[in-house]
Structure formats: C-alpha cells, structure tokens
C-alpha cells in the first residue's frame, strides 16, 4: 500500500457532496502532525499551514489546509474500528506469525478524559502488544478496569495466537480466560491476585514453606543508583492446589521476589503467577514476566511522556479513541526508525527535516 493511499479505504463520516476536504488528506495531516511533535488539533493545523508545500507532494488538498475545527469534527465522527484496523493490519504485516512470540495484554486510561467531579477516565483502552516488535496488534475501548475481564477474550479472539505466550496481569486471572487461551493453542503467564478463590493464598503459603528447598534463579542489577536483587522460583508441583484441574492448562506456578534499595530505603515485593508453560527454567519464565512490563515502558510511558497523551483535553465522542490510534501509529513509526536518537528528538527532527518525515512515512508501505 502506497503512503498516499493509506487512508483511502476508511469511510468518510461527512455528507457526500458537501465535503470540501478529502478524508485521506485529513488523516494524513494529523498523522504527520503527531510525528512532528504536535499536540492537539490547533498545533496540527499550524504545522500543516507551515508545511503546506511539502504536504502537497503527497496529498491533494483541493481546498487547502482544513481548519482545526474541521480536524476535530472529523475525528469525533470517524469510525474508531476502521482507523484501528489500519493500525492493526500494519502491525500484523510487520510481526507476521505470532508463534513463539510474547503477547502482552494490558489496559491504559486516557487521563485527559476525566471529567469534572469524576475520578475515573471516561476512555480506557485495552491493548495486545507484540513484545519483541514493540507494536500494538489489537485494541478495544472499555468502560472501566473490571470490563477487562470480558474484553480480554474478545480481543484475543481477533488474533491467531497459536503457539504464542500471552502474559496478563492479575485482572486476567480468570478461569474463562485461561480456557480460551489454551483452546486457541497458546500458553499463558498470568499474575495472581489475593481475592482469587483462595488460589493466591494456597500458592503463597506453599512457596513460603518450601522456597528454601527449591532451586532459585537469582539476578542482580545496579542502575540509576538503585540496587535490585530478583529471585525467581518455578514449580510444576501442583497437588497442593484445590481444584487445580479447573484452571485449564495449568502446569506451573511461579514466585518472584524483588528486593531493592532506593535512596537507602529497602523495598521488598513478592508476586505470584500461574502458567501453562512446562519444561521451562525459572530464568526463562522470569524473563517473560519481566518483559511483560515492556508495554508500560515502551508504549504507555511514551504515549504519556513523549506524546503527552494524559494532557490531551479532547474528550468528545470518538475523538479520544481515534487520537490514541494515531499516536500509536506515530509511536510505531518513530520507534522502528533506526536513527540512534531518542523518540522525542526524532519527533523534533521530523518537524525540521522533511526528508526524515518521508522516511518515517515510507515505513507504512506494505
């Protein structure tokens, strides 16, 4: 697909015959704006006006640059699922088969959508993320955190997860979710939560009594003034778990202890996991657990800090969801470019260097 044709297949929400601007032009202008360090529709409009000559090299712009009000109105009315399908199809094309790959499932609030008098963001997005390629493969808007329980199976069902390893935090510790993952011929590593039908207590108590007699994988890190010791213990012995057979595919339990010193203060955390993996070393499964937080560091953090997503005050209709899709597409393009500079500097470079912007966009050619 040529970059100039990227958005042609998305249905225009405007009335036929009354639209001054092409939808494909509008979407490409916003994508370019977010690649070039813009925040919000007004900054995107300012950027497009300054770079109109460059944009005309690959856009039609029959009536010039659309106003920021037009950009906002289109994004409010645009079908989120169609725009998301473009992001997802691009990601799938790059990632290819998911066999033996780690897929991370996690949710994120768009904190800028918190309305006056409320504590909860009105928009929360659940994502499936390819850990190695650092790309979003699927996403779904949910009403609140508890809705992840029903949304996770729906989201995973959109992908061929055969032979992949799905990691989820404790919200995914549900029998229906483990069953679906195994039925789809994949494996899981899922965090345990303390209110999960006594399972947490049984696993925690068992490791407390037996960890001294089990082989442990110990690693140490020292960075940014923080010393950390990580201990991972894996056991395939499950006869101490009541109704273990109800957890489809359950083959192992894992204990992870993190002991660290931060500014001369000692911090200790203990976490427990269930998994369908068998025949793995503790170090291997510990690696999957640690990499699970890659979605926080490589996607959520950059959306918030590099793209200031939480500071975005766009709240109405479909605009917040559509903008997060554009941000993820921009993040994927910037992250995959081989330039050895920070993502923040890449955005600023794209704003200054038109050839660099074209290099980023050319990654969409699939």
Q: Where are each of the predicted segments found?
A:
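Short amphipathic alpha-helical "interface-anchor" segments enriched in bulky aromatics
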Residues: 44, 280-313
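Generic secondary-structure signature for well-ordered alpha-helical cores
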Residues: 80, 157, 208, 212, ...
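Polybasic low-complexity intrinsically disordered regions
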Residues: 93-167, 173-186, 193
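Short coil/turn segments at secondary-structure boundaries
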Residues: 86-89, 215-221, 299-305, 341-345
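Membrane-interface transmembrane-helix boundary segments in multi-pass integral membrane proteins
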Residues: 316-327
């Amino acid at each position: 697909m040529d970059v100039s044709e990227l958005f042609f297949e998305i249905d225009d929400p405007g009335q036929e015959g009354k639209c001054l601007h092409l939808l494909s032009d509008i979407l490409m202008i916003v994508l370019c704006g977010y690649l070039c360090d813009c925040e919000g529709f007004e900054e995107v409009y300012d950027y497009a006006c300054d770079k109109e000559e460059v944009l005309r090299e690959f856009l039609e712009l029959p009536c010039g640059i659309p106003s920021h009000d037009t950009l906002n109105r289109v994004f409010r009315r645009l079908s989120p699922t169609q725009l998301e399908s473009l992001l997802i199809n691009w990601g799938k094309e790059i990632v290819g088969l998911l066999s033996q790959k780690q897929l991370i499932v996690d949710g994120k609030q768009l904190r800028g959508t918190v309305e006056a008098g409320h504590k909860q963001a009105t928009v929360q997005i659940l994502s499936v993320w390819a850990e190695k390629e650092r790309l979003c493969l699927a996403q779904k808007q949910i009403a609140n955190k508890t809705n992840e329980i029903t949304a996770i199976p729906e989201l995973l069902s959109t992908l061929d997860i055969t032979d992949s390893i799905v990691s989820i935090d404790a919200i995914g510790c549900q029998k229906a979710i483990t069953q679906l993952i195994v039925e789809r011929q994949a494996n899981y590593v899922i965090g345990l939560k303390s209110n999960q039908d006594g399972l947490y207590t049984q696993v925690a108590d068992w490791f407390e009594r037996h960890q001294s007699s089990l082989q442990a994988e110990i690693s140490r890190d020292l960075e940014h003034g923080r010393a950390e010791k990580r201990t991972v213990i894996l056991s395939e012995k499950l006869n101490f778990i009541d109704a273990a057979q109800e957890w489809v595919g359950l083959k192992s339990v894992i204990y992870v202890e993190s002991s660290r010193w931060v500014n001369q203060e000692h911090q200790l955390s203990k976490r427990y996991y269930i998994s369908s993996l068998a025949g793995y070393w503790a170090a291997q499964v510990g690696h999957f657990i640690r990499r699970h937080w890659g979605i926080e560091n490589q996607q959520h953090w950059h959306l918030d800090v590099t793209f200031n997503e939480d500071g975005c005050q766009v709240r109405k209709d479909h605009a917040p969801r559509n903008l997060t899709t554009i941000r993820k597409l921009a993040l994927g393009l910037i992250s995959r470019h081989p330039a050895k500079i920070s993502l923040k500097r890449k955005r600023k470079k794209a704003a200054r260097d038109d050839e660099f912007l074209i290099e980023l966009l050319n990654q969409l050619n699939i």
